[in-house]
């Protein structure tokens, strides 16, 4: 009997195994033939439970890791982010299909910890679900806060902050210059000052930072915004594997809650100050800061059940985080690329011709500085603020590139891979601003040309592109116009990237500076 049972068990196992192998043999090729036209290829090597998260978390440059996969698997492929599938787009034509034909389908955002815990429970425009609330809030931001006329009204704020920083650097040079008539300066810290002050003054009417003085509240504010940006760029296990969220691997959830509370207290104080001033009749006429504009538009209102205070605070945080980090990182990468390519500095002649050495840069000069604009475009091509797009989610089943994509699949656009496509860009890894004056002169960065998407495209395109470009152009042009710059070292510049929500330079940027304008210019600023 035992022999029979043993025979039956062995036979059963053998038969089942044989059937399984036969199915694999027959069905496998069939699936490959018929399935390839339906779903994009899936990258192998996924870990149990975690999927391909170790690939992204373990890489200092996830955009380059995904770019290498595109070389192997093509412009469309799928990876697993824990329990979630993500479609990676690495080709401008596929991006065009995404943000035109399928734009509505890909305008949703996935539910993420950072959006819940640090973005006022998804109230911030950048993370808000696509729908009536998002449309109404975006309309207010585009037409009333970041409109051309509103930004133009605050031109004096931008110019004065840049000029203040130039004068402060001139004073630093006078006190610290060496025997060669140069002074050393760390540019990441120096550019952070005018950009942060500029954005804060336009948003809430405050000026915090100075090269010669420190302020406890200012340091606290900058630190909190920096921490927000750091946490916004992390991959959390809870996002990929929701049932493991309670473990809070890395302590990110705790840190997000603490940072959110710190920022909310700060912005709430600003909001209360504005209400008190308005009650006294102050700050309601002339060129108002953005918080006053929002109080005029939103106070006492709700949108889709979200109260005015939450709308205002979330929008203030949106503009501060988007308007500072991206601008600073773009300017720093531009300076790195200029220093690495000394011939570029020779084109400072454009500044001398268009502006001269006896006056300061004005915003009206920027339109004539075509080479400077080309430098900024080329910088955004090589070092986009976000080399991987903010994640989106397919809100419905659709077809992309001939492949079927299921609802709920996440979308990642590899901006860096598109920007370095050799089929579009000759010498794609070389810094060649002249291409935007010749072969690619008609391509802009505003989302209309899918070969160059530093600020996204479609309905979710960044609403503050013009605002950001004005800031970058003015600050960069003013610095290059006012000072000669040198690399203090004979060693190659460290171009290591620190990947997060914004792609920043990992190490400081030390340069030598010397004034190159008439001394009267610095005195008149």
Curated annotation (Swiss-Prot):
Chief site of localization: membrane
Pfam families in UniProt: p450
Subcellular location: Membrane
Amino-acid positions noted as binding heme in the UniProt annotation, renumbered to this chain: 462
Organism of origin: Glycine max
Reported induction: By fungal elicitor.
Lineage, highest ranks first: Eukaryota, Viridiplantae, Streptophyta, Embryophyta, Tracheophyta
GO cellular component: membrane
Keywords on record: Heme, Iron, Membrane, Metal-binding, Monooxygenase, Oxidoreductase
Family per similarity comment: Belongs to the cytochrome P450 family.
Keyword Transcription recorded: no
Protein name from the UniProt record: Cytochrome P450 82A4
InterPro entries reported in the protein's UniProt record: Cyt_P450, Cyt_P450_CS, Cyt_P450_E_grp-I, Cyt_P450_sf, Plant_Cytochrome_P450_Monoox
MF annotations from Gene Ontology: heme binding; iron ion binding; monooxygenase activity; oxidoreductase activity, acting on paired donors, with incorporation or reduction of molecular oxygen
The keyword Metal-binding is annotated on this UniProt entry: yes
EC top class named in words: oxidoreductase
Lineage: superkingdom: Eukaryota
Enzyme Commission numbers on file: 1.14.-.-
Cofactor: heme
Cysteines paired by S-S bonds: none
């Amino acid at each position: 009997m035992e022999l029979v049972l043993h025979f039956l068990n062995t036979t059963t196992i053998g038969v089942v195994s044989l059937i399984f192998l036969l199915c694999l043999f027959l069905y496998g090729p069939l699936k490959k033939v018929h399935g390839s036209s339906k779903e994009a290829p899936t990258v192998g090597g996924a870990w149990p439970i975690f999927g391909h998260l170790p690939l992204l978390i373990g890489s200092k440059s996830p955009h380059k890791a995904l770019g290498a996969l595109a070389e192997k698997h093509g412009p469309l492929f799928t990876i697993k982010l824990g329990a979630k599938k993500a479609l990676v787009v690495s080709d401008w034509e596929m991006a065009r299909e995404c943000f035109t034909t399928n734009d509505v389908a890909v305008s949703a955002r996935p539910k993420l910890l950072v959006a819940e815990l640090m973005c006022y429970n998804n109230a911030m425009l950048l993370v808000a679900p696509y729908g009536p609330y998002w449309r109404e809030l975006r309309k207010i931001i585009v037409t009333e806060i970041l409109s051309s006329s509103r930004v133009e009204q605050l031109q004096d704020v931008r110019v004065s902050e840049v000029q203040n920083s130039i004068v402060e650097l001139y004073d630093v040079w006078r006190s610290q210059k060496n025997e060669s008539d140069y002074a050393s300066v760390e540019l990441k810290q120096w550019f952070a000052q005018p950009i942060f002050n500029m954005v804060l003054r336009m948003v809430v009417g405050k000026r915090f930072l100075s090269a010669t003085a420190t302020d406890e509240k200012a340091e606290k504010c900058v630190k909190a915004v920096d921490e927000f940006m750091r946490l916004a760029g992390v991959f959390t296990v809870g996002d990929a594997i929701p049932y493991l969220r309670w473990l809070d691997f890395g302590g990110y959830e705790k840190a997000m809650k603490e940072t959110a509370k710190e920022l909310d207290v700060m912005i709430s104080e600003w909001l209360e100050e504005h209400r008190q001033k308005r009650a006294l009749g102050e700050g309601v006429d002339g060129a108002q800061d953005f918080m006053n504009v929002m109080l005029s538009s939103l106070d006492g209102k709700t949108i889709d059940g979200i109260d005015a205070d939450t709308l205002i605070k979330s929008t203030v945080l949106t503009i501060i985080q988007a308007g500072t980090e991206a601008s600073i990182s773009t300017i720093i990468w531009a300076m790195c690329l200029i220093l690495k390519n000394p011939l570029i500095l020779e084109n400072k002649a454009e500044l001398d011709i268009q502006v001269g050495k006896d006056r300061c840069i004005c915003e009206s000069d920027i339109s004539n500085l075509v080479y400077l604009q080309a430098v900024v475009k080329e910088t955004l091509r090589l070092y986009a603020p976000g080399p991987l797009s903010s994640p989106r989610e397919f809100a419905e089943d659709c077809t992309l590139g001939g492949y079927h994509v299921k609802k709920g699949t996440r979308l990642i656009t590899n901006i860096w891979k598109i920007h370095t496509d050799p089929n579009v860009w000759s010498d794609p890894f070389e810094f060649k601003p002249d291409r935007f004056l010749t072969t690619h002169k008609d391509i802009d960065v505003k989302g209309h040309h899918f070969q160059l998407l530093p600020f996204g495209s479609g309905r979710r395109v960044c609403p503050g592109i013009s605002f950001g470009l004005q800031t970058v152009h003015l600050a960069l042009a003013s610095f290059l116009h006012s000072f000669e710059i040198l690399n203090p070292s004979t060693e190659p510049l460290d171009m290591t990237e620190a990947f997060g929500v914004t792609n920043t330079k990992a190490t400081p940027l030390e340069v030598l500076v010397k004034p190159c304008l008439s001394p009267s210019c610095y005195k008149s600023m």
